[in-house]
Amino acid sequence: MKRCAPSAWLILSVVIVCIGCKMAPAMGATRAAVPSTAAEEVTFMNGPLSLRGVVYKPTGPGPFPAVLYNHGSAPGMVNSQAFDAIGPRFAARGWVFFGPYRRGQGLSVQAGPYIGDQLDAATRKGGISARAAEIVRLLEGDHLSDQLAALAWLRRATFIRPDAIAVAGNSFGGIETVLGVEREPYCAAVDATGAAESWSKAPELRAAMIRAARNARAPIFFFQAENDFDLSPTRVLSAAMKDAGKPFETKIYPPFGTSHQDGHSLAYRGSAIWFDDVFRFLE
């Protein structure tokens, strides 16, 4: 078996923990120079629903390996910050980066309600437990459907190697990544900070992600900063994969910034810190 490039899968699991290591670079100093790459806006369909996303391509005709990147829950175009920070890095290393916007966010804002508004409505109606149940309903339903529609678009693209499509994502996008790799045979997956804010308050979400990790159809690399909201997702989900005999890696990076929110932002503000580790895992 192989991952996304011509190198063998690691069957043994690897756990790298950096708690207590030297402090990571300051948040404002983590952006290494990356060749400028212009993003191309594209349209993809989910049944009758028209959705949009951005693609960063390497130079040349391809076909190339690709990563489908699931964004977080931020409103409007805020998630473009992650795409702009990460997409050019992949393109510079010969990978296509596809950032699809799910319904209600970014370039797909007109395609449906914003998930944050839906969760707030659930909270007003039924409290924290209702919000937790709504997270699972939406991320396993409409939003997973949007992810799989984006994957179908990638597989049809002539410049893509359909056997070399990885999936990644941060925060809610990390949750989407784990759910997606249960459904589809991606070549590899990267969950950055997925469920860190929701884990302790959402038992249904914990159960869904543990199930998905046990059933994962590709290896997963879990990473977080030491000062993220909660490190339990990485620990519990990697343990579930280990129990199921599935390949995985984990890495807990030194604190990023000073607050929990800073730590949670490592996935997009600190791409210079983790990119080489992720790229090694994918290849």
Located regions from the model:
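Short substrate-entry loop that stabilizes the transition state in hydrolases
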Residues: 62-64, 72-109, 198-199, 230-231
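Alpha/beta-hydrolase
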Residues: 70, 100-102, 192, 253
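Primarily recognizes the serine-hydrolase "nucleophile elbow" in alpha/beta-hydrolase
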Residues: 139-215
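C-terminal catalytic histidine-bearing segment of alpha/beta-hydrolase fold enzymes
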Residues: 247-283
